[in-house]
Amino acid sequence: MAHMVGADDIESLRVELAEIGRSIRSSFRRHTSSFRSSSSIYEVENDGDVNDHDAEYALQWAEIERLPTVKRMRSTLLDDGDESMTEKGRRVVDVTKLGAVERHLMIEKLIKHIENDNLKLLKKIRRRIDRVGMELPTIEVRYESLKVVAECEVVEGKALPTLWNTAKRVLSELVKLTGAKTHEAKINIINDVNGIIKPGRLTLLLGPPSCGKTTLLKALSGNLENNLKCSGEISYNGHRLDEFVPQKTSAYISQYDLHIAEMTVRETVDFSARCQGVGSRTDIMMEVSKREKEKGIIPDTEVDAYMKAISVEGLQRSLQTDYILKILGLDICAEILIGDVMRRGISGGQKKRLTTAEMIVGPTKALFMDEITNGLDSSTAFQIVKSLQQFAHISSATVLVSLLQPAPESYDLFDDIMLMAKGRIVYHGPRGEVLNFFEDCGFRCPERKGVADFLQEVISKKDQAQYWWHEDLPYSFVSVEMLSKKFKDLSIGKKIEDTLSKPYDRSKSHKDALSFSVYSLPNWELFIACISREYLLMKRNYFVYIFKTAQLVMAAFITMTVFIRTRMGIDIIHGNSYMSALFFALIILLVDGFPELSMTAQRLAVFYKQKQLCFYPAWAYAIPATVLKVPLSFFESLVWTCLSYYVIGYTPEASRFFKQFILLFAVHFTSISMFRCLAAIFQTVVASITAGSFGILFTFVFAGFVIPPPSMPAWLKWGFWANPLSYGEIGLSVNEFLAPRWNQMQPNNFTLGRTILQTRGMDYNGYMYWVSLCALLGFTVLFNIIFTLALTFLKSPTSSRAMISQDKLSELQGTEKSTEDSSVRKKTTDSPVKTEEEDKMVLPFKPLTVTFQDLNYFVDMPVEMRDQGYDQKKLQLLSDITGAFRPGILTALMGVSGAGKTTLLDVLAGRKTSGYIEGDIRISGFPKVQETFARVSGYCEQTDIHSPNITVEESVIYSAWLRLAPEIDATTKTKFVKQVLETIELDEIKDSLVGVTGVSGLSTEQRKRLTIAVELVANPSIIFMDEPTTGLDARAAAIVMRAVKNVADTGRTIVCTIHQPSIDIFEAFDELVLLKRGGRMIYTGPLGQHSRHIIEYFESVPEIPKIKDNHNPATWMLDVSSQSVEIELGVDFAKIYHDSALYKRNSELVKQLSQPDSGSSDIQFKRTFAQSWWGQFKSILWKMNLSYWRSPSYNLMRMMHTLVSSLIFGALFWKQGQNLDTQQSMFTVFGAIYGLVLFLGINNCASALQYFETERNVMYRERFAGMYSATAYALGQVVTEIPYIFIQAAEFVIVTYPMIGFYPSAYKVFWSLYSMFCSLLTFNYLAMFLVSITPNFMVAAILQSLFYVGFNLFSGFLIPQTQVPGWWIWLYYLTPTSWTLNGFISSQYGDIHEEINVFGQSTTVARFLKDYFGFHHDLLAVTAVVQIAFPIALASMFAFFVGKLNFQRR
C-alpha cells in the first residue's frame, strides 16, 4: 500500500514524524543525555579551551590521550547528563559504534537551524584547525586555450535516425573500414576559453541552454565523454589531469538524477560515503590531535566527536550522511525508497538534492555542480547555496555551480560570476563588477530586475535591445564574440591572462590536495561494500525471485504431468520422450536466466556513473553480482530436480538423482552468467535482449537435440562443441541412458540406452558426464571474466554518433552571417508586434470558472508508517481547501516541497488514480464531470512524457489534430500550430527529435516547453501547469510565462505551480494560492502592484520581519511562512488565514461563483472525444508509423535478427527439406521449423516489451487528456506492426526456403509465409497484451517466459499431439505454436506419400505425420482460421485491458 502514496504528498508527514520523534525524546533519556550541553560544569572559551576549574573533564580527557593512537582517534567525550538530573558528567564513547538514534540526536544537537548552526559548526572546525597552526588543502583550477569539439556526420535533409538513415550509417561505417571517407564536420562546443577558479570562492556559471556549461563542468572535472575531442590544458595546483586522479580530487554533480530505484535515500548516500572514503580527514584529525596534545589544548566535545566520527574509513553507516541529509533537507525522507517512473518514491526535488548529497558527502575539495536546484522552491535553493557558500569560504573549497534561475537572494551569495554563451566566456570575475562591465558595453539592468535574469537575456539576440541605455546612440546588436573580446580587454580579463602566463608554484600545493590513488578503500572493503549493496537489492527485489521460483514450480508441474512415469515405458519410442524431457529441462533453466539481462542492463547507467567517479573497480561490482546468484541458482535447480525427477520416472538411483541436479545447477548458473555477460557487452535493454535472443538461439540449435551432431555440416560442427547446452545435453543423456535399466540388448547388438544415444548422436561413455560438468564450470568462469572485462573496458552507453543536417551545419558555421544584421533588425522590430498578431489568432472557446469547497484528500496509511506507531487507517494530504480559479486571471499555486501543490492540481484535474476525495468541485457552477472536463482542460505535467521518436512539430500537430474541435478546418489548425511553436520559441527546433529524457534528443528546458506547447495547442478553457518553468533558464522561463500570460489574457483560466519564480515571473501572476505542509491553505488572494497585497498580509502578522528593498517577494513569503518560523513564533498560519477577513471574502466569492449564471448550461459535447473514432485512428496511425520508422533499435534490430537467424538455420539444415528416409530426418526438418518459429517469435516478443512500455507511459498522459479512446489507440498500435511483421516473414521464406530445400511450389511457399506471418503477429501482440496487464517491464519480462514454457512444450515437437495426456490436450489446442507447426508441416509434407522408415517399420510421410504428430492435411482450412484467430484474440485483449487497467499511481 505504500506505493500508492506520492512522495510530495507524504513529505509533510515525514516532518510531523520527525517532530513526534523529538517530542518523545524522553523515552530515549540515556541517548539524549549523552548529547546535552552542561554549561554549568564547564564553558568553552573562544579558542575552544576549557576553564581550569573543570578538573574532572581534564582528567577524563587525559585518559583518552593515554589510549593507543588508533583507539584514541575513535574515542571522544560526550555529555552524559540531563537537565533534570542533579548529577551531570561525560562518558567516553567509540565513534565507530554510534547507533542510529545517537547519530540522529547528535546531528539534531549540532544543527537545529540549518543556516546558522551549520555556519557555527564549520567555524568551530576551522578555528580548531587554525589554532594548532595547520593549513587545509586547497585546489586552484586553471584552464588555458580550452577547446572541446564534437565530430558530427553530415546528412542531407532532416538528421533523423530513420531505418533508412541508420542503414546508410551502418554501410558508411563498413565503407570507412576500407579507407573511404564520409562527410563529417567538427562543431565547436567550447571555443578557446581561459580562466582560473580559485579556492575559497563560490562561482556561479550562467548561460543559455546549449552554450556549453555542462561540457565545461565535465571537462574541468575530468569527466568528459570520449566522443568529444578536448584540447588545451586543465590543471589543478599546476598538475595536469593525467598526473593525478581528477575524479577523486573533484566531484561532478550531474543535472541528471541517476539512482537505483530500490534503495532508500540514506542507503544511497551511505554507500557513496563508504566508497568515497574520508580522504585526508584521518590525517588531519591525527595531526590536529597530536598538536593539541603537545599544546595541552582540550577541544570542544561536540566538534571533536563530529570530526572523529567523519574521519573513520569504511563505516556502513556514517555520521557524515546524517549531516549531509540534514543540511539538504533530506532527513525527512531518508528512509523512503527513491523510486522511478512506475514505482512511487521521493519527489523530483528530493531526487535532485539526493544527486547533490551523493557527491558532497565525500571528502573532495573541488565541486563542479550542474543545475543542482532544478525543481526546488526558492527557499530550499537558497538554503543549499548558502550551505555551499559557507563550505567554500570556511573550508577553502573550490566550488563552481551552474544554475538556471537563481533568485536574487541566491545570486547575491556568489563571489564570482562566469557567463557563457555559444561556447565562449563573456565574463568571469567578481559579482560586483559584472553590471559595470555590461554598462560599459551599453546595457543597463532595470530596477526590480534580477541580475541573473538580466545577464542571461542581455546576450540573447531577441532580448538584448530592451536593455540598451544610450538614448542618444542607435542600438546595434553586440554579438557574443564582441562581448568576449571586450572582457579580455578589461582589467579583470587581463589579470587572468597575466596569472595564467606564470606557472603555478607546485611547492605551495598541500600534499593532501590532490588524489593520486584511484580508489579510496582497500580492495577487500570495496568488495564488502558492493556485496552488501547487492544483497540489499536482491532483498528488495524478492518478488522477482519468488515469482521466478513460482513460475519454475508451475513449469515443473506441467512438465512432470506431461511426461508422467505411468505413461513412459522403457523402450525406444519412449526413450525419445525421455530425451525430450531432459532437453526441455535444459531449455527451461536456460530461459530462466533471461531476466538477468534486463536486470543487469537497467543498472548499468548507475554503475558507469559510479565507475566514472571512481567509487569502485568493475570487479568489485561483478563478483558480488555473480557470487550472490549461486544460492539462488542452487535452490531453483534443486526445486526443479526434486519435483520432476521421480514423477517423470528417471532412473531411481540416488547417485543419478544428485548427478542430474548438479549438472542442472551448472547449466542454470552458466545461463545466468551468459546473460549477464551479454548485458554488459551490449549495455542497453533492447540491444541486450536481441543479443540474448541470439544467445538462446545459438545454444538451442547447436545443442544436438534439434539436429544431431552427425547431421550438422562439417564446417558448423564447432558450434556444437562451443555450446554450453551441448555439454548439458551430453551429461544428462549419459547419466540417464547408461543406467542399468537401459541395458536391454537390441537386434543391432547394442543396448537400448546406447541405441537411443546413437540416434541422437550422443553415443559417449560415462566419463563424459564429468567432462561436461568441467566444461560448464569453464564456461561459467569464462562468461564472468568477460563480464568483468566488459565492465572494466567498455565505456558508458552514450547516444550514438551525432548527426547534423547540412542546413543546420551552415547555420552553425556562419554561412548565413550576411543576413544576420537584417535578421536581427527584423526580429527586434517584430517582437512587440508579435503579441498583437497572436491575439488575432484566438480560436473559439468558452471561459470557465473552477470552484472548490472543503476539499479533502486521503490515502491509505503507508505500511511503514503503521510500523512506526501510526494507528490511523487514512493519511490526510489536503485539508479543507476552498478557493476559485477564474477566467482571465493567472493564478500561482505555491508552497514548500511537500505542501500538496501537485496533489491539489491532480485532484482538481481528476488525475488521481488512488485515494479518497471529499468536497465539492464545480465548473462554472455545475458539478464537475470528468469526461467533459478533460475536453476543456489541459494539464502540463511536471514529468515531460512524450513519444521519443517523433519531432517537436509532429508532437504539437498530433495534439492539435486530436484535441481541437472538428469544426476547425485543417488550414486554421496548421496556422495555429505554427503560431504556438513561434510563441513558445520552438520553431527553430521544430524538426528535432524529442528523444529519451537524459539520453538523447531535447534538453530539459526544450522538453518542458514542448509539454506546454502540446497543451496550449489544444485551445483549452482551463489549463493546469505543474512547475512549467522548472528546468528552464531565466530567459526561457520568461518566454514561457509571457506566452502563458498572453493566453490568460484571452480569458482562459490558468493555474501554475511554481518553485523558484524571479520577481518578474512572480509578479506576472494576478493571484496566489499558498499552501503549507500538510496541504493546508495559508493565503488566497491577489498579489497587487509590486506584490503589495501579499506583503501587507504577512507583515501584519506580529514579529514577522519586514521585506528588504529589492528582495524577491516570493522568496521572502516562503521564508517568513516556513514551519521553523511557525515554531519560533508559536503561530499557525493556516489558522491565521482561516480567522482573517480575507478568508471570509474568499468564502463568499466561492459561494457566489458556485452558482450557475442565469441562462447558462452545463458543458455538453455530442461525443466523448473531440474527433470521431476514425479521426482518432488515423492520427494515431500517422504518429505510430513515424515512430516505428525512426526506431532502428527496435525494428532494424528485429529484421537483422530474422535475417541472421534464417541464415544460421539455412546453413545448419542445408538441403535437409526433401531428404526424408527415417523418422530422425523428419524430426530434423521439424526441429528446424520449430526452432525458427519459437525463437523468432520470442525475440519479437522480448524486444517489443520495452518499446510498448515506453509508448504506454505516453498513452497514459494522452488518455488522461481525453485525446482518444483505448480501442483507437490499440488498433493503431496493432495495425502499425503488420508491415514490419510481413517483412520479417518474407525474410524468413526468402532465405530459409531455398537453403533448407523445401518443395518448390507456390502453394507451399504461400503457406510458409502465412504461417510465419501469423506466428510473428501472435508473439508481438502477446507482448502488447503482457504490457497491458502488468505494472512494469520487469514483471512483463518474467511473465512472458511462462508463456514460452507452454509455447515450447506444447508445440508438438517435444511431445507430439498423439502423446499429450488427456488432461493437457486442451492446452495443446490453445498453444499458437502448435497450430503454426501444424500448418507449416502439413502444407509442406501432408500430401507427400513417399516411403519412410519409422522406428524400424515402413510407412508414408503423410501417414507418419497423421499417426505420430496428429497433423491432418485435409484440415488445413481450419488451421488457417485458428492461426489468424490467435493474433486477433490477443489484439482484442490488449485493447480491452489497456482501456481498463491503469498502473500509473498518482
UniProtKB/Swiss-Prot annotation:
Q: Where in the cell is it found?
A: Cell membrane
List cystine links: none
What upregulates it?
Induced by cycloheximide (CHX) and cold/dark treatment. Up-regulated in response to iron (Fe) deficiency.
Which keywords accompany this UniProt record?
ATP-binding, Auxin signaling pathway, Cell membrane, Detoxification, Membrane, Nucleotide-binding, Repeat, Transmembrane, Transmembrane helix, Transport
Q: Which residues participate in ATP 2 binding?
A: 895-902
In the record, what terms sit under GO molecular function? Answer: ABC-type transporter activity; ATP binding; ATP hydrolysis activity; auxin efflux transmembrane transporter activity; efflux transmembrane transporter activity
Q: How does it sit in the membrane?
A: Multi-pass membrane protein
**A Pfam family it matches:** ABC_tran
Tell me the SUPFAM superfamilies matching this sequence: P-loop containing nucleoside triphosphate hydrolases
Q: Where is region (Disordered) located?
A: 810-838
Q: Where are the transmembrane segments?
A: 544-564, 581-601, 615-635, 661-681, 687-707, 773-793, 1194-1214, 1226-1246, 1282-1302, 1313-1333, 1339-1359, 1365-1385, 1422-1442
Alphabetized InterPro entries for the sequence: AAA+_ATPase, ABC2_TM, ABC_transporter-like_ATP-bd, ABCG_dom, ABCG_PDR_1, ABCG_PDR_2, P-loop_NTPase, PDR_assoc
Question: What's one GO BP annotation on this UniProt entry?
Answer: cellular response to indolebutyric acid stimulus
Q: What positions does the entry give for ATP 1 binding?
A: 207-214
Q: Looking at the record's lineage, which domain of life comes first?
A: Eukaryota
Where the record annotates domain ABC transporter, the positions are: 175-447, 850-1103
The question of whether Membrane is a record keyword is answered with: yes
Q: In which tissues is it expressed?
A: Expressed in roots and, to a lower extent, in seedlings.
Recorded hits in PROSITE patterns, A to Z, give: ABC_TRANSPORTER_2
Q: Where is the ABC transmembrane type-2 domain?
A: 525-737, 1175-1389
Regions of biased composition (Basic and acidic residues) lie at 817-838
What happens in the null mutant? Answer: Defects in efflux of the auxin precursor indole-3-butyric acid (IBA) associated with developmental defects such as abnormally long root hairs and increased lateral root production. Strongly reduced coumarin (e.g. highly oxygenated compounds scopoletin, dihydroxyscopoletin, esculetin, fraxin, fraxetin and esculin) exudation in the rhizosphere, especially in iron (Fe) deficient conditions. Hypersensitivity to iron (Fe) deficiency.
- CC annotations in GO: plasma membrane; plasmodesma
What the protein does comes down to: Together with ABCG36, regulates auxin homeostasis and responses by playing a dual role in coumarin (and derivatives) and in the auxin precursor indole 3-butyric acid (IBA) efflux transport, thus influencing roots and root hairs development. Mediates coumarin exudation in the rhizosphere, especially in iron (Fe) deficient conditions, with a strong specificity for highly oxygenated compounds such as scopoletin and derivatives, dihydroxyscopoletin, esculetin, fraxin, fraxetin and esculin; these molecules improve plant Fe nutrition.
**Recorded family membership:** Belongs to the ABC transporter superfamily. ABCG family. PDR (TC 3.A.1.205) subfamily.
Q: What is this protein called?
A: ABC transporter G family member 37
